[in-house]
């Protein structure tokens, strides 16, 4: 086998490989011999078909089939010999594939880029310093109460937190528009479900009131024909209801699976969950800063094959989310461009973290793997069952090992980075958009 390597452009490489004619011809003849033993051809007894007949009928297709197999095998041998690390599958082109002649073909593919890590100590991180306070716990209990609140009809003027049942008809430029009309619509004031200004205009109304309100659609509204448009809505209020929060007592605790210990036991359990979620959120915030700093400090050529693969993964995930929400017949065709930027980011992160792992010779820490599994399992009713499920599923274990290795790489980068601790509150970390 003769091999030559050519750099075509960027990360693209082309191997030209020549395989001696005798090697190809021997495989073709052996394959044709097998066919002659099994193939039924009119006018000949099984196993008695003359080689010339087999060659005439099957020679061309068999040679193409054999050539494809030889190209695959010799490509693998060539990249091992040349110490080349391809990113993605190669494309093959046979330049010469005739009886009695050497099989010459080209394999075009991309390689992984050379990644050089630098200035890791310049990555700046603000690490949140935060605990779960009694006030945070009290606020969480109010949230839990609201999750189990009931409603009581009233006749007073509405305020934030109340629920309205209303009809509305919207118009833009005097014309009704699609999606602008509803009857018996339930609206919780303060939930932010409607366009800006709508809830404010109906707050203070009471059952039986009718009014026409004026609002403006935001410039970034999803419907192109309504962006920035002034609108009028005719409103009819049918019913108003105020929230009734449940008492925080033993019965309330039982709603969350606490059969013994009452409210105090519930506070302990909720506090544990909050602390676990807070730890994960802080870790995620630090990781985001590390990754952003790593990306900003490095330029990396990205193999288009890897980006394409990642686009396909992201698009498939998006389609799966849509499938649970709408009729498969109406599923949209999602263009690759929607996912390209995210795919490029993910590929770049993978290449950089892969280099961190390689340079520092990081190995999977099984203790960390077990901690990650235990943390994931703790959110379920029967953690032992979840842990056992992971232990018996090789694919899930591999995924968790990859997560652990990635976390080890991030932790190493944090050690090298400039880290400053900054005091923060539970809400700032858990609800950053509410700031």
Curated annotation (Swiss-Prot):
One of its GO terms (cellular component) is cytoplasm. The keyword tRNA-binding does not apply. Keywords: Cell cycle, Cell division, Chaperone, Cytoplasm, Isomerase, Rotamase. It holds the Pfam family Trigger_C. GO terms for molecular function: peptidyl-prolyl cis-trans isomerase activity; protein folding chaperone; ribosome binding. Residues 161-246 form the PPIase FKBP-type domain. It is found in: Cytoplasm. It catalyses: [protein]-peptidylproline (omega=180) = [protein]-peptidylproline (omega=0). The keyword DNA repair does not apply. One of its GO terms (biological process) is protein transport. Its main location: cytoplasm. Its EC number is 5.2.1.8. PROSITE patterns: FKBP_PPIASE. Involved in protein export. Acts as a chaperone by maintaining the newly synthesized protein in an open conformation. Functions as a peptidyl-prolyl cis-trans isomerase. Consists of 3 domains; the N-terminus binds the ribosome, the middle domain has PPIase activity, while the C-terminus has intrinsic chaperone activity on its own. Belongs to the FKBP-type PPIase family. Tig subfamily. This is Trigger factor.
């Amino acid at each position: 086998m003769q091999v030559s390597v050519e750099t075509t452009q960027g990360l693209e490489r082309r191997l030209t490989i020549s395989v001696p004619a005798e090697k190809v011809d021997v495989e073709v003849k052996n394959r044709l011999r097998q066919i002659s033993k099994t193939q039924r051809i009119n006018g000949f007894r099984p196993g008695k078909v003359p080689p010339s007949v087999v060659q005439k009928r099957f020679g061309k297709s068999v040679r193409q089939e054999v050539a494809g197999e030889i190209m695959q095998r010799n490509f693998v041998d060539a990249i091992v010999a040349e110490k080349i690390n391809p990113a993605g599958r190669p494309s093959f082109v046979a330049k010469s594939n005739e009886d009695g002649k050497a099989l010459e073909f080209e394999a075009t593919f991309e390689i992984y880029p050379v990644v050089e890590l630098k200035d890791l100590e310049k990555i700046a991180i603000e690490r949140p310093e935060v605990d779960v306070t009694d006030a945070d716990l009290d606020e969480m209990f109010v949230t839990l109460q609201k999750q189990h609140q009931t409603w009581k009809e009233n006749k007073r003027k509405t305020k934030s937190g109340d629920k309205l049942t209303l009809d509305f008809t919207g118009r833009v430029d005097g014309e009704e528009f699609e999606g602008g009309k509803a009857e018996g619509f339930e609206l919780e004031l303060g939930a932010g479900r409607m366009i800006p200004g709508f809830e404010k205009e109906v707050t203070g109304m009471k059952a039986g009131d009718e009014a026409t309100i004026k609002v403006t659609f935001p410039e970034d509204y999803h419907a192109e024909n309504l962006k920035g448009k002034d609108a009028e809505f005719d409103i009819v209020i049918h019913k108003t209801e105020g929230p009734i929060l449940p008492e925080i007592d033993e019965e309330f605790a039982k709603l969350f699976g606490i059969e013994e210990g009452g409210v105090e036991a519930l506070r302990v359990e909720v506090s544990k969950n909050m602390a676990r979620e807070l730890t994960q959120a802080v870790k995620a915030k630090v990781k985001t800063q590390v990754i952003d700093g790593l990306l900003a400090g490095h330029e990396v050529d990205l193999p288009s094959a890897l980006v394409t693969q990642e686009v396909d993964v992201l698009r498939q995930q998006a389609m799966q989310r849509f499938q649970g929400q709408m009729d498969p017949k109406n599923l949209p065709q999602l263009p690759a461009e929607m996912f390209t930027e995210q795919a490029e980011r993910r590929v770049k992160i993978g290449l950089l973290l892969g280099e961190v792992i390689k340079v520092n010779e990081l190995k999977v820490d099984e203790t960390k793997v077990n901690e990650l599994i235990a943390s994931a399992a703790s959110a379920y009713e029967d953690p032992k069952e979840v842990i056992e499920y992971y232990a018996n599923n090789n694919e899930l274990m591999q995924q968790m090992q990859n997560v652990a290795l990635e976390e080890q790489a991030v932790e190493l980068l944090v050690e090298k980075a400039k880290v400053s601790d900054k005091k923060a509150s539970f809400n700032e970390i858990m609800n950053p958009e509410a700031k």
